[in-house]
Amino acid sequence: MTTLSCDLAIVGGGLAGGLIALALAEMRPALDVRLVEGGASIGGNHLWSFFTSDVGVGDQWIVEPLIGHRWPAHRVRFPAHERRIDVGYRTIVSTRLNAVVRERLRERAMTGCKALAANAHAVVLADGRRIEARGVIDTRGAGDLSLLECGWQKFVGHELELAAPHGGDTPTIMDATVAQIDGYRFAYTLPLSPTRMFVEDTCYSDTPGVDAAALGARIGAYAAGQGWTVKQVAREEAGALPVVLDGDFEAYWQSGGHNVAKAGMRAGLFHPTTGYSLPDAVRTAALIARQRDYSGTALCDLLHGVAKRTWEQRRFYRMLARMLFRAAEPQMRYKVLDRFYRLDPALVGRFYAGRSTIGDKMRILTGKPPVPIGRAFSAMLGRPA
């Protein structure tokens, strides 16, 4: 058995692992970091989009080299109102993450290396090699989600090459004027070039199964409805993000491995209501880059503490998720978001960043809820509707 030695091994080359590796390469260049990924590339096949308000000013250096598309504003559309929000929107393409990580880490970015097991100080690879390290961070996606009560944000996205310019210049992050199927459904569009449009069909659904053919057909119908002629589908992606209503944090943390540091989805570091993990991934990468002790025990204690505090601080978001899934009838869930997007854009930005103030929370709950009051109270208290 061949044994490799390093200071820190990061297992999982997705968004969380990639950002940690890049932050350490910048802030701790003397540290020998190995990024271990079972797939052929870092980041897989994804787009990650975020609002400029999602990332603190002091952390922007982490994502700045990765941004492939920038817009000064974004839009939302609902049956009863439409709104342009003058908050910047950014997109990272996984191919760019892969390129930048490989440039910075070179041979220390170990793709095509499946990890069979990881503990606080070692990683065992499927090819028989073993990596021994002062510390290990496991970022290999979600733990056992059955330990959490979840709804799902599931989606299929197609990057469309069009026969003629589409004429758009602003992302529409929610177009809920589409038929409400399988819960709260909306189309999501990113104008990537004058003739290229990324279109995603998304549902806040009770089930995680993704019917790629059905959602792909809806994307085709949506494009036709916009008057676009599709030359080809240049790229496709699909997924289902957990929307957390409740659960046992400690059991979830342990399900991803005992006594080993974890980050990203595996640590439960994602927004309970949206399922998005980029803001937490950036904050975690910055935090790790500021550390001095990279031993397995120190990293586990640090990240477990962060994840547990974050879970406790996000009770409000889990309550809102319960209201969305338990209090609203599936075809009427869009009304919850319709009302939300009439609020102050700064409040909306803090919500997505996971940094809502007490005043924000009061404002979100003020007034007549867009769902039956009795069901709303039951959801708030964590009772079945």
How would you label these PLM feature ranges?
Residues 2-35:
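N-terminal Rossmann-like FAD-binding beta1-loop-alpha1 element of flavoenzymes
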Residues 23-27, 31-80, 156:
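N-terminal FAD cofactor-binding segment of flavoenzymes
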Residues 52-120:
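A conserved beta-strand/loop capping segment in the N-terminal third of enzymes
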Residues 108-233, 245-251:
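Predominantly flavin-linked oxidoreductase catalytic cores and closely associated redox partners
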Residues 181-184, 240-262, 312, 316, ...:
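FAD-binding beta-loop-beta segment adjacent to the flavin cofactor pocket
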Residues 189, 195, 255-273:
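Short FAD-binding loop at a beta-strand-to-alpha-helix junction that anchors the flavin cofactor
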Residues 208-238, 261, 282-307:
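Flavin-binding catalytic cores
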Residues 286-385:
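C-terminal helical "tail/cap" subdomain of flavin- and related membrane-associated enzymes
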